[in-house]
Design a protein with these regions (language model features):
Chain B
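Short acidic, glycine/serine/threonine-rich loops at helix termini
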Residues: 20-22, 63, 94, 119-125, ...
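Condensing-enzyme catalytic core mediating Claisen C-C bond formation in acyl metabolism
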Residues: 1-26, 165, 197-262, 266, ...
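Active-site-proximal alpha-helical scaffold in enzymes
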Residues: 83-114, 142-179, 217-223, 333-356
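Beta-strand segments within the central parallel beta-sheet cores of soluble alpha/beta enzyme folds
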Residues: 44-53, 78-84, 108-113, 161-168, ...
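Conserved catalytic cysteine-centered active-site region
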Residues: 2-4, 54-111, 115-133, 137-144, ...
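Conserved active-site and cofactor/substrate-binding residues in soluble primary-metabolism enzymes
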Residues: 23-31, 45, 63, 87-91, ...
Length: 361, 390
């Protein structure tokens, strides 16, 4: 068979804020969708369907895509909801385009974290038999992970604070902060401080994706969705929390499928909500160790740049993060060309990993 | 471009019951997977990717796929977690299809699971409605279907007796299916009508049960199918269509199933179906209530609009009729929600493969399977013994 390449031809974000209490979920998603449609020059009626990403628990609604499928072009058309990071939705959408079934789709990720009680939601992700009685949440698990990682790597909370500061400096959403300000934020789960975690936000991102024929006929500025891969990791208490071999394996598979060498990448987007996880994941990708690794996060020049728009720590929401990163990367690649690896994680302590490779002309 | 041909070559189900006290939800999912893989001497080493479906608010486990990663055999592999309501099992099968048809993977395991006895399904289903406009007035599945069935009675003239005949057919068919939950060999129309109203016009025996159970399939690419099954169930259509989110936006809902009509139109075109009553040998239709099967048959073009009652009166959808509908016993006999729509697909595949045992319909060459969920959403698959021609 000959697979049809998939392209990103439209990019849209909703205005991201700690609480978008001026809009409901449908309106939040529509903000991103209408921006992406305008960017690509399409009307909603031309869209054949969508793959959406959201989490019922955060949305407080079973089948949480009910809120958005209508504004995502799903009426009497095809919408599927992935309950994972937005990169997984993007991988599914690529398959739908590549097999020729769909030609013009939206990929939409949305979350309104302000409407949920984070502890209640996160507690529900733990083993109901053995773990929930301890009343943990994602930060408790991440704190244990950070402690182990700092011991193993020799890195410290000061290094993580520099990663957060670098993300804040590049963010279009959050105010800049110095490492000292980050270190002065309250302890949440030792050794983690409040600002080591990306703040909870209300966010939505939409990409318009299409096949080769539509991209050519419309002569649209575009970024190629080259390939992708995904690997699931073990449950958080059943693995070494200081390494991420599944990320490396997914990245290696994708690069091999694309025929790319790692040094041909101009941009890397890492999707994890805690600063120490960013360092851990970058290390897993072979981007360095120790002080040199931290400097990679701070560098504004040299390839590949990491989280050039601040990434998750720069302001977005869980589930949306990977797709938002793909959107930021696509925006740059469309203007300047280059090659990007975009990563998204799902699960406690960044359990499972998905990557997608993008190329601008 | 030409999609890679995809076929279901293996299926596995648990023996569905109201309450599995002997197994956790992970163990239930694994039981279906093990049965599926063992049926063809496959192992996890043969599987490239996993697609999982479960409605996690029903049991209250957020990120259930990550918790069950080892039970699902997904360690070190891609794991797609879908969550689309009652359709989710069929959405799993549709996703398996795209992952293979695109050339990304060769062998994909699809699994749907639910342990409803661990949670409160109706409480979770109540959250499906818009929190401002709908939740206060449409709680759970029964009220929803009662409203729809009333509309359907008004539009089609179908009677409570005709609906009861569907309920009886399902529970009789279930007696020949070793996996079915609700087997009632002596059930009569009179007993269905004598069972209490849950909400008019739905009698208790018009409604599906609440089950613990799981279902798994293996779908493979092209030539690898032939070595795995004597008669692979080739996918000729895998279609999804949704309706609008608010119940009031779907005119004459159930009587008119716009999403089912849209999905059927596309699926029939892809698979070359001109006359569904003639061209299909068997159908597995997602009918949470007895009325739904009749209304869905109308909207699928199996009979004229408004003629659903006559369809059951004349026995056309009975096991010995020209188009047996739900020889497995259907949703009315078995309903572990995350698995239910995948069971429709798996049962259709079993019929095409000629491996349905006591509930096998003779000489099946083409089968239809549908999933229903959310606000009148549809997934639809068409399976055939013939490999699709490029």
């Amino acid at each position: 068979m000959t697979s049809s390449p998939a392209w990103i031809v439209g990019i849209g974000h909703a205005a991201c804020a700690p609480a978008r209490d001026d809009v409901n979920t449908t309106e939040l998603a529509w903000e991103a969708i209408s921006a992406a449609l305008d960017d690509a020059g399409f009307q909603l009626g031309e869209i054949e369907g969508a793959v959406t990403a959201s989490q019922d628990f955060w949305e407080g609604r079973t089948i949480s895509s009910m809120s958005v499928n209508e504004v995502a072009g799903g009426t009497l058309r095809s919408e599927a909801k992935v309950a994972a990071d937005g990169v997984m939705a993007l991988l599914y959408a690529m398959a739908r385009i590549e097999d020729g079934d769909q030609h013009l789709n939206l990929v939409v990720a949305h979350a309104k974290e302000s409407q949920a009680d984070p502890h209640t939601v996160e507690l529900a992700a733990f083993d109901p038999y053995y773990e929930r009685a301890l009343n943990p949440d994602e930060t408790v698990a991440a704190g244990l992970q950070a402690d182990l990682y700092y011991r193993r790597s020799g890195l410290t909370p000061e290094h993580s604070a520099r990663v957060v500061a670098a993300a804040r400096r590049r963010s279009g959403v959050l105010d800049p902060l110095s490492p000292d300000e980050i270190l002065a934020s309250p302890i949440t789960a030792r050794p983690l401080r409040a600002l080591d975690r990306a703040p909870l936000m209300d966010a939505a991102t939409c990409l318009v994706v299409c096949d080769e024929q539509i991209a050519r006929e419309r002569d649209l500025p575009r970024v190629r969705l080259v390939t992708g891969a995904a690997r699931s990791g073990p449950w958080w208490t059943a693995r070494d929390l200081t390494v991420a071999p599944e990320l490396r394996a997914a990245a290696d598979e994708a690069l091999e499928r694309a025929g790319w060498t790692p040094d041909s990448l101009t941009r890397i987007e890492l999707g994890a909500p805690y600063a120490h996880q960013q360092l851990l994941l970058a290390e897993a990708l072979g981007l360095g160790e120790g002080e040199a690794l931290v400097e990679r996060f701070e560098a504004d020049a040299g390839d590949p740049r990491i989280n050039a728009d601040g990434g998750w720590l720069g302001g977005t929401a869980g589930t949306v993060a990977g797709l938002a990163s793909a959107a930021h990367a696509a925006h740059e690649l469309r203007e300047r060309g280059g090659r990007a690896l975009v990563h998204g994680a799902t699960g406690l302590c960044a359990q499972s990993h998905a990557v997608v490779l993008l190329e601008g002309r | 471009m030409t999609p890679v041909a995809a076929a279901i070559v293996a299926t596995g189900q648990t023996d569905h019951v109201s309450r599995r006290l002997d197994a956790s939800m992970a163990e239930i999912a694994r039981e279906a997977i093990d049965r599926c893989l063992a049926s063809r001497n496959l192992s996890f080493d043969d599987i490239d990717a996993i697609v999982a479906g479960n409605m996690e608010m029903f049991e209250g486990i957020y990120l259930v796929d990550q918790f069950f990663v080892d039970a699902l055999g997904a360690l070190g592999k891609p794991l797609f977690k879908l969550n689309t309501g009652g359709t989710v099992g069929a959405s799993v099968a549709v996703c398996c299809y795209h992952l293979i048809a695109s050339g990304r993977y060769q062998k994909v395991l699809g699994v749907g699971f639910e342990k409803q006895s661990d949670g409160s399904t109706q409480a979770a289903i109540t959250t499906v409605g818009d929190p401002i406009w709908e939740r206060a007035v449409m709680a759970g599945a029964i009220g929803n279907f009662a409203t729809m069935a009333s509309t359907y009675i008004h539009e089609s003239g179908v009677t409570e007796e005709q609906a009861a005949k569907v309920a009886v057919k399902a529970r009789h068919n279930a007696c020949r299916n070793p996996h079915a939950h609700l087997k009632l060999p002596n059930l009569t129309v009179e007993e269905v009508l004598a069972s209490e109203y849950l909400a008019f016009p739905i009698h208790r025996l018009d409604m599906c049960p609440s089950s613990d159970g799981a279902c798994a399939i293996v779908m493979v690419a092209g030539d690898s199918a032939d070595g795995l099954a004597e008669h692979p169930a080739w996918v000729h259509a895998a279609v999804t269509a949704h309706d609008q989110q608010y119940m009031g936006d779907s005119p004459k809902r159930l009587a008119v199933m716009r999403s089912l009509r849209a999905a059927a139109e596309k699926g029939y075109r892809q698979a070359g179906i001109a006359d569904p009553l003639r061209d299909f040998d068997v159908a597995e239709i997602y009918e949470p209530a007895s009325y739904a099967e009749l209304a869905m048959c109308e909207n699928l073009g199996i009979c004229e609009m408004g003629a659903g009652g006559r369809l059951i009166d004349e026995g056309l959808t009975q096991m010995d009729g020209p188009l047996p509908v739900n020889p497995s016993g259907g949703v009315q006999s078995t309903n572990p929600v995350g698995a239910t729509a995948l069971i429709r697909v798996a049962e259709a595949a079993l019929q095409v493969m000629g491996e349905a045992g006591e509930h096998q319909v003779p000489e099946v060459r083409r089968a239809l399977a549908t999933g229903y969920g959310g606000n009148a959403w549809t997934d639809l698959m068409i399976l055939s013994r013939e490999r699709p021609t490029p």
